Curated annotation (Swiss-Prot):
Keywords: Endonuclease, Hydrolase, Metal-binding, Nuclease, tRNA processing, Zinc. One of its GO terms (molecular function) is 3'-tRNA processing endoribonuclease activity. The lineage of its organism: Bacteria, Bacillati, Bacillota, Bacilli, Bacillales. Belongs to the RNase Z family. It comes from the Bacteria. This is Ribonuclease Z. Zn(2+) 1 binds at residues 63, 65, 141, 212. It comes from Bacillus cereus (strain G9842). The gene is rnz. The active site is at residue 67. Transmembrane segments: none annotated. It holds the Pfam family Lactamase_B. Gene3D superfamilies: Ribonuclease Z/Hydroxyacylglutathione hydrolase-like.
Length: 307
């Protein structure tokens, strides 16, 4: 599991930062990539990374402001042009389906893969399979905006091979049957219950990716005990009132949410273009004063998520 930040700026592109898009690479877990927001020129940013459009399985849109969706029609079309045939699902607020349909229709773009658009109308679980589930809550922004909590389900423990070898059980197909929890009878009549030869389960990871938001309780709830919290930091602490007026957060408020939620790690993004060059490091300094395990994303930077 690895983050690749494709765009980390706020509102409009700048020389140093493109607008919002985050890839969550789940190559080891499911051989796919999930994308969170898709601002203008996202597909161009992708060209500079290991992200492959054909591997994008899901796109989660936080809200319908242009800096979060204007790259979507182009990416959907290019995925088809590049030979993508596997299904893709887009999740987002009401209106995202109309936006996609109109853009593709007017431009006569025909995608050659199954494309599903799921409009989120209420909070709760928007996706679940045997590996992950994704929950969402409304945030505090100028228009309807959602944050996402991605929960990896606990992973089955490893087969206790040494224990089996000590009992004289030789490696072979029987190991798989025991791993699957079957009850197996050996040639000498010994009965083995596979569940007794499985180690403790490995705790799944929790990832929280928030859209644009003021400091709010929903952010804390989504981030509770997260291994990684990705939070916007549009403004510095001295501009807290301005952040509130424009429905955004400061770096210090992001750190406060991480602290309250008992998150393990905080990554700041959605940085205003007023912070050019190294001036953005002041945002990082302010956040670390409150929550030390904070990093700030820059375009094309990757962040592995350890198990």
């Amino acid at each position: 599991m690895e983050f690749v930040f494709l765009g980390t700026g706020a509102g409009v592109p700048s020389k140093g930062r493109n607008v919002s898009a985050i890839a969550l690479q789940l190559l080891e877990e499911r051989g796919q990539t999930w994308l969170f927001d898709c601002g203008e020129a996202t597909q161009h940013q992708i060209l500079h990374t290991s992200v492959r459009p054909r591997r994008i399985e899901k796109i989660f849109i936080t809200h319908l402001h242009g800096d979060h969706i204007f790259g979507l029609p182009g990416l959907l079309g290019s995925r088809s042009f590049q030979g993508g045939t596997t299904p893709l699902t887009v999740y987002g607020p009401k209106g995202i389906k109309q936006f996609i349909e109109v853009a593709l229709s007017v431009s006569t773009t025909h995608v050659k893969y199954p494309l599903e658009v799921v409009e989120i109308t209420e909070e709760g679980t928007v996706f679940e399979d045997n590996e992950f589930y994704v929950e969402t809550k409304r945030l505090s922004h100028g228009i309807e905006c959602f944050g996402y909590r991605i929960v990896e389900k606990d992973i089955q423990g490893a087969l206790l091979v040494d224990k089996l070898l000590e009992m004289g059980v030789k490696p072979g197909p029987i190991f798989k049957r025991l791993k699957d929890g079957e009850v197996v009878e050996l040639e000498d009549g010994t009965i083995l219950n596979g569940n007794e030869f499985i180690g403790p389960p490995q705790k799944g990871r929790i990832i929280t990716i928030l859209g644009d938001t003021r400091y709010c309780e929903a952010s804390r709830e989504l981030a509770q005990d997260a291994d990684v919290l990705v939070h916007e930091a549009t403004f510095a602490a001295e501009d807290e009132q301005q952040a509130h007026d424009y429905f955004h957060s400061t770096s210090k408020q992001a750190a406060s949410i991480a602290l309250q939620a008992n998150a393990k790690r905080l990554i700041l993004t959605h940085i205003s273009s007023r912070y050019q060059g190294d001036t953005y490091k002041e945002l990082l300094k302010e956040a670390r004063e409150l929550f030390s395990n904070t990093e700030i994303a820059t375009d094309l930077k990757s962040f592995p998520v350890e198990k």
